[in-house]
Amino acid sequence: MDVSKVVSFSRNFAVLVKVEGPDPKGLKMRKHAFHQYHSGNATLSASGILLPRDIFLSGEVAAKVLFEAGQDMALVLTVASVVEPFLTLGHRTSSSISQDPVKLIPGAMIEIMVEGQLKSEKEAPFWVPAQLLSLVDVPVSSAALQSLIEASSGSKDSGWDIGWSLVSAANGSQPSINIEHYSKPLMQLDEPHNANFMAKSATRMAILGVPLSLLGQPSMNFASSSSKGDTLVALGSPFGILSPVNFFNSVSTGSIANSYPSGSLKKSLMIADVRCLPGMEGAPVFAKNGHLIGILIRPLRQKNSGVEIQLVVPWGAITTACSHLLLEEPSVEGKASQWGSEVLSVKSDASIPAQVAIEKAMESVCLITVNDGVWASGIILNEHGLILTNAHLLEPWRYGKGGVYGEGFKPYVLGAEEFSSTGSKFWEQKSQTLPRKAPRNHYSSVGENIREYKHNFLQTGHRDIRVRLCHLDSWTWCPANVVYICKEQLDIALLQLEYVPGKLQPITANFSSPPLGTTAHVVGHGLFGPRCGLSPSICSGVVAKVVHAKRRLNTQSISQEVAEFPAMLETTAAVHPGGSGGAVLNSSGHMIGLVTSNARHGAGTVIPHLNFSIPCAVLAPIFKFAEDMQNTTILQTLDQPSEELSSIWALMPSLSPKTEQSLPNLPKLLKDGNNKQTKGSQFAKFIAETQDMFVKPTKLSRDVIPSKL
């Protein structure tokens, strides 16, 4: 289904939630990325979704709640974080939801902005008063988020927090009415920062009541299941109260990157590969067929890098948490809810075969740990357990600060100082060890018959290398040995499993140069390591740039004719630490590149959407060797130095020859190296020949236009 149709339909449900109340000390806006503040009143905003009362609430509970509210109502679901600062003290300081009715402080009020088409006499969006009915915890989503946060508790620098990176937790500075300006530091109140509190706070929802007569009754379907890579559409209002006309119901599209728990049809939490901004928390997230997937919440933010991971609470988890309020079981996918007249027609999705191919290719991506200290990703090349990964995982000292390929190369990218080595620190919990699962089958390892290829860079010290495979719907840990590490410009290495449990799923490669602008999926274990219990994540983008080399590698398997071949891929898909060694896939699920690195700004900020991969055309000898793993000379040819490849991967391509240009009437100096004149005599001759030029200025031609700096 066309995304524009999904957007048009979903605008019936997306709303902007505004909460205003007295704040004489300027404390309500803390932990919020933006606000308005006038005459002692603070205003916050978030996004929300409009829902029908008769579907969401049971008759008995609805009568009680709506009787207390005083009128018949429709419902709005939003995040609790937008209303919690304005709750009475007892509800604001409690870590759990009180049984007593929730109340706002005196003078606080809630309004929602809805699309104009929901009221026939108004064409423009308009504000509707709302009342706070209830707060709801989502236990399964909270537990999932807590487990992700606690997985990094052993590493102080790589820990996680909840909230937007625009929020300054250190001094409390917040952007005010103008997005470009920040208010003065605010006094901070002590809050618990344990994982349980953060997870509960992030996943808590608020149910609002709005007059039903103002809103009409649109119709909606609810998605019963979603898979990684599925397209999603989010409608939210970033910085909504700062300019509702400009920001109301903005559209952001992306895909599902991962979900928790892995391998389960009932999702507790989803990780979204989508660009979002503050104020979009509470936004409804729809599938490509128009079914509601869930609600966007505040992101998970990495403390040391500021990287934001967008999170979605699935609709199924919300309905489970609200089971005491539900009138009936949520409608299954493909079945319309029994309210309203407009139903979005659902047609078969032609992209399903491609999605199946991508899901199959994801089984070829594994997780690699070295000495329980770092982890990265790897790619299964054949059924005998040959794994392709990056050399910097095994020999990081070769790719450290000060030059990736030697002292002469310093990779600067838009002022960048160095590549970000995408191997990531493992959680520093020495007492915990990774389990090794006994294999169901023992295949004789072909690696035993391989003559290990050694060179100066291959270290023979003890290293505990383990690979986590995802096969037969289970995870299996296997020890592995180093087979090959490239000693030249290519950041590649090969590992061999000591034993092969069951049947593996090798990757399928595409050796052609991918067209610019075509879809690129990056699959790997970025950010979330072995203790997080997540399968590989998938982030989508496009092929932004293909850097070609004019000379082929000097190999026996590749033609030695002078011709262009792809030497580097750049994509807009997000690449995070731990994702190196992952696969870049095209829309058919075929591998087109090996992820090596992303970019880092000179100030230290990582740029995940500027990343670099080795094209499969360069990796052709690796795939040739993987066929029978006998001809090790194929690997030796990769160690031949290539000045052109080195310059490309150092981000220092050879410069074009300089054209000799001279100023008008400027005599050409003698440049013959055999000229025996001293510097003084040459300078004297220069002054004599140019004496007239210094008497009066030469009028420049009109063709020469001065350039403004």
Swiss-Prot record:
Keywords recorded for this protein, A-Z: Hydrolase, Peroxisome, Protease, Serine protease
InterPro entries with a match to the protein in the record: Peptidase_S1_PA (IPR009003), Peptidase_S1_PA_chymotrypsin (IPR043504), TYSND1/DEG15 (IPR039245)
GO cellular component: peroxisome
Top-rank taxon: Eukaryota
E.C. designation(s): 3.4.21.-
Residues of the active site: 392, 491, 580
Regulation: Inhibited by N-methylmaleimide (NEM), but not by E64, benzamidine, aprotinin, leupeptin, pefabloc, pepstatin A, EGTA, EDTA and 1,10-phenanthroline.
Consequence of changing residue 237 to A: 75% reduction of proteolytic activity
Record keyword Hydrolase present: yes
Effect of residue 392 to A: Total loss of proteolytic activity
GO biological process annotation, one example: protein processing
Disruption phenotype: No visible phenotype, but loss of processing of glyoxysomal precursor proteins. Increased resistance to the herbicide precursor 4-(2,4-dichlorophenoxy) butyric acid (2,4-DB) and to the inhibitory effects of indole-3-butyric acid (IBA) on root elongation.
Signal peptide start-end: none
Location in the cell: Peroxisome
Molecular-function GO terms, alphabetical: endopeptidase activity; serine-type endopeptidase activity
Gene3D superfamilies named in the record: Trypsin-like serine proteases
Pfam family, one: Trypsin_2
Similarity comment: Belongs to the peptidase S1B family.
Known partners and oligomeric status: Monomer and homodimer. Multimerization requires calcium ions.
Role: Trypsin-like serine endopeptidase involved in the processing of glyoxysomal higher molecular weight precursor. The dimeric form carries out the specific cleavages needed to remove PTS2-containing presequences, whereas the monomeric form degrades the removed presequences and misfolded proteins. Not required for degradation of glyoxylate cycle enzymes during seedling development.
Name of the protein described by the UniProt record: Glyoxysomal processing protease, glyoxysomal
Organism: Arabidopsis thaliana
